[in-house]
């Protein structure tokens, strides 16, 4: 798949690809956003709008802006990858989540991913996290044994966990906590990807290099 403003990203196994800068994903007006992979419709909620920064991104106000997805039926996955670009402008805010609890959030002194609501949590300290106001490429992969975290295309560490991820009948939401509706994201949101496989370290780097000239 040709990435907006750059070379190809890995497209094998893609379930979700959303990009405000692509006409295939957003026309530039209205509230309907298309998943480029299956043409399913996501909806801009409240005052969330596209801005021209970085070729087209979403401007979340931190109050009530978010994107709501349809009910997806991706099944039970033994491996997957979640990846996104974002520029956070304040702490303690969510960017991507689903209900139940597969989610990221930015804390005052940590960055967190939860796999399946229990276990699979991974923290790293603020002195190696991406500062406020800076674009970051965040990736979590699950291969059936470990959740691995990548930042700016670089491996950060892993958390051992087992089992499968039930992505059947889930509603993905971008910009808020899917369960409670809190932790509203404040900042700019870029491309969002979900794969039905665990990307390798080389594939994570490939995707980062394909789009870094747009976002960094």
Role assignments for model-derived ranges:
Residues 1, 118-119, 168-190:
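Extracellular glycan-interaction patches encoded by glycine-rich segments
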Residues 1-64, 204-216:
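Extracytoplasmic low-complexity segments
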Residues 8-11, 50-52, 75-77, 105, ...:
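Extracellular/periplasmic catalytic domains that process cell-envelope and extracellular macromolecules
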Residues 17-20, 137, 191:
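Extracellular/lumenal ectodomain signal focusing on beta-strand-rich modules
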Residues 27-29, 45, 61-119, 130-132, ...:
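Extracellular glycan-recognition modules
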Residues 128-132, 164-165:
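Short proline/glycine- and polar residue-rich coil/turn motifs
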Residues 151-171:
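Short, solvent-exposed beta-strand-to-loop segments that form ligand-recognition rims
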């Amino acid at each position: 798949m040709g990435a907006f403003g750059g070379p190809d990203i890995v497209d094998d196994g893609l379930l979700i690809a959303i990009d405000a800068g692509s006409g295939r994903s957003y026309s530039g007006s209205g509230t309907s956003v298309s998943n480029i992979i299956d043409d399913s419709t996501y909806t801009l909620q409240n005052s969330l709008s596209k801005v021209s920064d970085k070729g087209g991104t979403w401007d979340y106000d931190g109050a009530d802006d978010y994107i709501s997805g349809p009910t997806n039926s991706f099944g039970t996955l033994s491996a997957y990858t979640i990846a996104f670009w974002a520029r956070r402008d304040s702490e303690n805010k969510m960017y991507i989540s689903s209900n139940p609890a597969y989610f990221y959030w930015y804390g005052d002194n940590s960055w967190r991913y939860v796999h399946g609501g229990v276990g699979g949590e991974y923290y790293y300290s603020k002195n190696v996290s991406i500062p406020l106001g800076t674009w970051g490429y965040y990736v979590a992969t699950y291969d059936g044994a470990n959740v691995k975290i990548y930042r700016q295309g670089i491996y950060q560490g892993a958390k051992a966990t087992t089992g499968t991820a039930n992505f059947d009948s889930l509603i993905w939401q971008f910009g808020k906590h899917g369960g409670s509706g809190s932790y509203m994201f404040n900042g700019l949101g870029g491309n969002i990807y979900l794969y039905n496989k665990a990307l390798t370290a080389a594939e994570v780097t490939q995707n980062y290099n394909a789009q870094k000239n747009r976002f960094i």
